[in-house]
From Swiss-Prot:
Positions contributing to ATP binding: 77, 95-99, 532
Protein name (Swiss-Prot/TrEMBL): Protein translocase subunit SecA
Source species of the chain: Thermosipho melanesiensis (strain DSM 12029 / CIP 104789 / BI429)
E.C. number(s) listed in UniProt: 7.4.2.8
Quaternary assembly: Monomer and homodimer. Part of the essential Sec protein translocation apparatus which comprises SecA, SecYEG and auxiliary proteins SecDF. Other proteins may also be involved.
Keyword Nucleus included in the entry's annotation: no
Domain of life: Bacteria
UniProt keyword terms in alphabetical order: ATP-binding, Cell inner membrane, Cell membrane, Cytoplasm, Membrane, Nucleotide-binding, Protein transport, Translocase, Translocation, Transport
Family note: Belongs to the SecA family.
GO BP, one annotated term: protein import
Length: 853
C-alpha cells in the first residue's frame, strides 16, 4: 500500500502542472503565431532555465500534435512527458500512447540544440515513430532523423513543403472544425496532404547532427564503438550523449543488460579443432564426466572426466598451459550440446546457425556468440564453421546508457524492477494512471502435471473461444513450442497465425489483426511489441481479447507484458496462464513443492489445479529467479565498470592522438619507457648497465652508459630524442600523418588483445569464488596489473615503431580503412567458459597507471 501512496504523492506534483497547461487555450491561436512563440522560446532557453518553459512548450506541442497528426495528448500523457523530462521511467500501460508522450520532452530538450536520442527495440519502430511524429517536429522547425541497422540513415522531410506553408498561411489542420470527441479516427481527418512526410537518405553523421535522432539501442551503442576505431576525427558520427529516451526501457536496460555490444573481426583458429572436440564431447557422459548447472549456465569437468579426456587425447595433463586451448574447445563443445538448444536458443537456416533473441523471439542474423561458442554449435549441427572472431571494442548497454547526461525510459512494465533502475541507472519509476479505467480480468493460473496435458487444455480452450468468435492471442517461450501448438491447432482445423522469429517481417501486420473477430494468433514472447491490438467490430461484446500464456517467464514483468496486450484503453479483456510441472522455471526452481501439493490433492490426469496460493508460490519462484538474474547483471556491471574506466581512458587517449599531439605522446612514452627500465635495473643510484643495454636492443641502441641513475636517464633521453628529431626531419610533412597512423595501430592492437585477455580473467576469477575470494576484488587486482602492463607495451612499441618508421603510401591507409570495414557486430553471451586459472608473475617495481586524459 505504501508503494502506491508514494506514487500518488509524486503524481500530485505533476497534476498541478497539468492544470497550468490546461489553463492555456491555444485552439484559436493562428498556426504561424504558435511557431513564432516556439522560436522565441528557442532563443531564450538554456540548460539552467529549461524547467521554466515546460508548461508553455508542452501546451504548444499538444496543440501542434492535434493540428498536424490529429492526436491531442490527454492529461495523463502530459504527466508521462514530465516524468521523462525529469530523467525517470514512466510506466504506462499498453495502448496509452507512449509514442506521443515522448514528443513533449523531446521538443523541450531538443530546443537546447545538443541532440536528443529516441531509442527503440527495432528498425521498424524507429522508422514508424519518426515518420508518425515527424510532422510535429518539422512544424516546430526541428530536424528529425532515423538510423537503422543496415547502416542507412534518413531525414524526415515534408513531402510537399509548399502545401505545409499553405497550411500555416491559411491556418489549416487535420482536425475538422466542430469535431468535439477526444479521439479523431483516421477516416475523419482532413487536409492530411499538407502534413505528409517522407524519408530522404543522408549520412550517419548528418543524422546525428539533426535535433532528434530515432534508432535502435544496438545502433547507438555500435556507433559509439565505431567512433572509437576511426583513424580520422572527421570520420566520427556521434556528437555527444546529452538526453536519451528509451522506449521499452525494461527490455533494453534490464533484459539485454547481460548482452555486451561487441565489434569484432576474424581470427585464425582452425575449423578442424572444433570438429575434433565435437566428437570428444559426444563421448562424454553427463553427470559422470561432467556436470551442467542450468541456473548458472556452466559446465564443469569431473575428475573422472579429466582422466578420460587425457586418455582420449593422449596427453598427461589437461591443465598444462600448453593444453589450455584444448580445455577451451572441449568446454565450448559440451555447452553447445547441453546448454544451447536448436529452435530455442538458435535455428539452423541454409547451413547457418542464427541466434534467437531469448527476450523477443526474433532472429538475430549476423550476430554470433563469442569465445568460440558459435563455432562449437556449428560443429554440433554439422554446418560450415566460420572463423572465430576477435574483439576490437566492447561495451555493455549499462555503461553505454549511463554516459548520457540525462536518461529516461518508458514501458508498460517497470515497477517490479524499480530497485534495479534506481541502483544501476539512478532512475525512479513513476506509474502513470490510465486514461480510462482498466477492466481486464486476470484469472488464476491453471497447473497441469505434464506439458502434453497443458497443451491439450490450451487447444481445448482456444477451440471453445474460437467457436464463439472471441479473438485469442497465445504467448509461447520458444519457436519450437509455437510450432508444436500450431500443429495441434491444424489437426483441429482452427485457422491461426504464427508470429515468431522466423516470420518477423509480417510481425506488425499480424499483431494489428490479432483483435479481429475469430482471430487466433500464436506469438513468441513479446514479438510485435510497440504495435497496438485494436478490437474489431463486435469483439467487446464477446469479452474482448483473450490472452493465453503457455509458460511463466523468468520475470513477472514479461508475463505482465503479455497480459498487457489485452484491455487497452478501457477495453474488456481476459488473461489466463496454463502451466505444467515440466515447465523450465517450475522444474528448475520450484517443481518439488508443487508436485507435493499435486500429490496431496490427488489430481486426475488431464485435470488442472488452481488456487491463489499456487499463483503466489509461482510468483515467489519468479522473484527468486529475478533476484538471481539481478545479481548476475550487477556482477557483470561491477566488472564492466572497472573496464569502463579503462575504456574511457583509452578512448580519451585515442582522441588525444587523433587531435595530432604526437610530440607529447612520444615524450610520455619515452618517459615511461626509461622510468620502467631504471626501476627494474637500478638499485638506488647504481644501475646495471649491461642489463639496461640488453633492454635497449629493441631500439638498436648499444652505447656505453653512465653508472648513475640520473645520468643514465638524461643520457637515454638525449639519444632517443636525437633519433626522434632526425626521423621527423627525414620524413618532413609526412611524419605527422605516419606517426599518428602508427600510434593508433599500436594502441588499437594492444587494446584488442587486452579485451580478449579480460574475457579469460572474468572466467578465471569466477572460479576463485570457490576459494572464498571475492571475484570482483580479484578482477580489479588482475585487470589493474594487466592494464598497467598493456600501457607499458603501448609506450614501448610506440617508441620502437616511431624510431623505425618509413614512408607509407596512401594505399596503406586505404588498407587500414578496409580492415575497419571488415569488422562486424556481435551478440556476446555472458561469459560461460570455465578456464584453468593462469597465474602471471608480478613485475618488479611499483604499479602506475599513466594515461593521458
Amino acid at each position: 500500500m505504501k508503494l502506491f501512496d508514494k506514487n500518488e504523492r509524486v503524481l500530485k506534483r505533476y497534476w498541478k502542472r497539468v492544470k497550468k497547461i490546461n489553463e492555456i487555450n491555444l485552439s484559436n491561436v493562428p498556426f504561424s503565431e504558435l511557431i513564432l512563440n516556439m522560436e522565441k522560446i528557442k532563443n531564450n532557453i538554456t540548460g539552467e532555465n529549461i524547467d521554466d518553459y515546460l508548461v508553455d512548450v508542452f501546451a504548444i506541442v499538444r496543440e501542434i500534435a492535434k493540428r498536424t497528426i490529429g492526436l491531442r495528448p490527454f492529461d495523463v500523457q502530459l504527466i508521462g512527458g514530465m516524468v521523462l523530462h525529469e530523467g525517470k521511467v514512466a510506466e504506462m500501460k499498453t495502448g496509452e500512447g507512449k509514442t506521443l508522450v515522448a514528443t513533449m520532452p523531446i521538443v523541450l530538450n531538443a530546443l537546447l540544440k545538443k541532440g536528443v536520442h529516441l531509442v527503440t527495440v527495432n528498425d521498424y519502430l524507429a522508422k514508424r515513430d519518426a515518420m508518425w511524429m515527424g510532422p510535429i517536429y518539422l512544424a516546430l522547425g526541428l530536424r528529425v532523423a532515423v538510423i537503422n541497422t543496415q547502416n542507412k540513415s534518413y531525414e524526415v522531410v515534408w513531402k510537399n513543403k509548399e502545401l505545409f506553408e499553405k497550411a500555416i498561411r491559411e491556418n489549416l489542420s487535420v482536425w475538422p472544425e466542430g469535431f468535439a470527441e477526444e479521439f479523431l479516427p483516421d477516416d475523419k481527418k482532413v487536409n492530411t496532404d499538407c502534413f505528409d512526410v517522407e524519408l530522404k537518405e543522408i549520412t550517419r553523421k548528418e543524422a546525428y547532427e539533426c535535433d532528434i535522432t530515432y534508432g535502435t539501442n544496438t545502433e547507438f551503442g555500435f556507433d559509439y564503438l565505431r567512433d572509437n576505431l576511426v583513424i580520422n576525427l572527421d570520420s566520427r558520427v556521434q556528437r555527444g550523449h546529452f538526453f536519451a529516451i528509451v522506449d521499452e526501457v525494461d527490455s533494453i536496460l534490464i533484459d539485454e543488460a547481460r548482452t555486451p555490444l561487441v565489434i569484432s573481426g576474424p581470427s585464425k583458429t582452425k575449423a578442424s579443432d572444433y570438429r575434433r572436440f565435437n566428437q570428444v564431447a559426444k563421448r562424454l557422459k553427463k553427470d559422470v564426466h561432467f556436470t551442467v548447472d542450468e541456473k548458472k549456465k556452466t559446465v564443469v569437468l569431473t575428475d573422472e572426466g579429466i582422466e578420460y579426456v587425457e586418455k582420449l587425447l593422449n596427453i598427461e595433463n589437461l591443465y598444462d598451459p600448453e593444453h589450455v586451448n584444448k580445455m577451451y574447445f572441449l568446454l565450448n563443445a559440451l555447452k553447445a550440446h547441453h546448454l544451447f538448444k536448436k529452435d530455442v536458443d538458435y535455428i539452423v537456416n541454409n547451413g547457418e546457425v542464427i541466434i534467437v533473441d531469448e527476450f523477443t523471439g526474433r532472429l538475430l542474423p549476423g550476430r554470433r556468440y563469442s569465445g568460440g561458442l558459435h563455432q562449437a554449435i556449428e560443429a554440433k549441427e554439422g554446418v560450415p564453421i566460420k572463423e572465430e572472431s576477435l574483439t576490437y571494442a566492447t561495451i555493455t548497454y549499462q555503461n553505454y546508457f549511463r554516459m548520457y547526461k540525462k536518461l529516461a525510459g518508458m514501458t508498460g512494465t517497470a515497477k517490479t524492477e524499480e530497485e534495479e533502475f534506481k541502483q544501476i541507472y539512478g532512475m525512479e519509476v513513476v506509474v502513470i494512471p490510465t486514461h480510462k479505467p482498466m477492466i481486464r480480468k486476470d484469472r488464476d493460473d491453471l497447473i497441469y502435471r505434464t506439458e502434453e496435458e497443458k497443451f491439450q487444455a490450451v487447444v481445448s480452450e482456444i477451440k471453445k473461444r474460437h467457436e464463439k468468435g472471441q479473438p485469442v492471442l497465445v504467448g509461447t517461450t520458444s519457436i519450437e513450442k509455437s510450432e508444436r501448438l500450431s500443429q495441434m491447432l491444424k489437426k483441429e482445423n482452427i485457422p491461426h497465425n504464427v508470429l515468431n522469429a522466423k516470420y518477423h517481417e509480417k510481425e506488425a501486420e499480424i499483431v494489428a489483426r490479432a483483435g479481429q473477430r475469430g482471430a487466433v494468433t500464436i506469438a513468441t514472447n513479446m514479438a510485435g511489441r510497440g504495435t497496438d491490438i485494436k478490437l474489431g467490430p463486435g469483439v467487446k461484446e464477446l469479452g474482448g481479447l483473450l490472452i493465453i500464456g503457455t509458460e511463466r517467464h523468468e520475470s513477472r514483468r514479461i508475463d505482465n507484458q503479455l497480459r498487457g496486450r489485452a484491455g487497452r484503453q478501457g477495453d474488456p479483456g481476459e488473461s489466463i496462464f496454463f502451466l505444467s510441472l515440466e515447465d523450465d522455471i517450475i522444474r528448475i526452481f520450484g517443481g518439488e513443492k508443487l508436485e507435493k501439493i499435486m500429490n496431496l490433492v490427488k489430481i486426475e490426469k488431464g485435470e488442472p489445479i488452481y488456487h491463489p496460493m499456487l499463483t503466489k508460490l509461482i510468483e515467489r519462484v519468479q522473484k527468486k529467479v529475478e533476484s538471481i538474474n539481478f545479481a548476475i547483471r550487477k556482477n557483470l556491471l561491477q566488472m564492466d565498470t572497472v573496464l569502463d574506466a579503462q575504456r574511457k581512458a583509452i578512448y580519451s587517449y585515442r582522441e588525444y592522438l587523433l587531435s595530432g599531439n604526437l610530440d607529447e605522446h612520444f615524450y610520455d612514452a619515452m618517459e615511461d619507457f626509461i622510468e620502467r627500465i631504471l626501476e627494474e635495473f637500478c638499485e638506488k643510484e647504481v644501475c646495471d648497465t649491461q642489463k639496461i643495454n640488453e633492454s635497449l636492443k629493441i631500439l638498436n641502441i648499444d652505447e656505453k652508459l653512465p653508472d648513475t641513475r640520473e645520468e643514465t636517464k638524461k643520457y637515454l633521453k638525449d639519444i632517443i630524442l636525437k633519433r626522434y628529431n632526425k626521423k621527423k626531419e627525414e620524413l618532413g610533412e609526412d611524419f605527422s600523418k605516419i606517426g599518428k597512423y602508427i600510434a593508433l595501430r599500436v594502441l588499437d592492437e594492444n587494446w584488442r588483445q587486452y579485451l580478449e585477455e579480460v574475457e579469460h580473467v572474468k572466467e578465471a576469477v569466477s572460479l576463485r569464488a570457490y576459494g572464498q575470494k571475492d571475484p570482483i576484488i580479484e578482477f580489479k587486482k588482475e585487470t589493474f596489473r594487466m592494464f598497467d602492463e598493456m600501457m607499458a607495451r603501448i609506450y614501448e612499441q610506440s617508441i620502437v615503431y616511431t624510431l623505425n618508421i618509413r614512408k607509407i603510401t596512401d594505399e596503406a591507409e586505404k588498407e587500414s580503412k578496409k580492415e575497419l570495414e571488415k569488422l562486424y557486430v556481435q551478440h556476446d553471451e555472458f561469459s560461460l567458459v570455465n578456464r584453468k586459472e593462469r597465474r602471471t608473475a608480478e613485475k618488479k617495481g611499483k604499479k602506475r597507471l599513466k594515461v593521458k586524459r
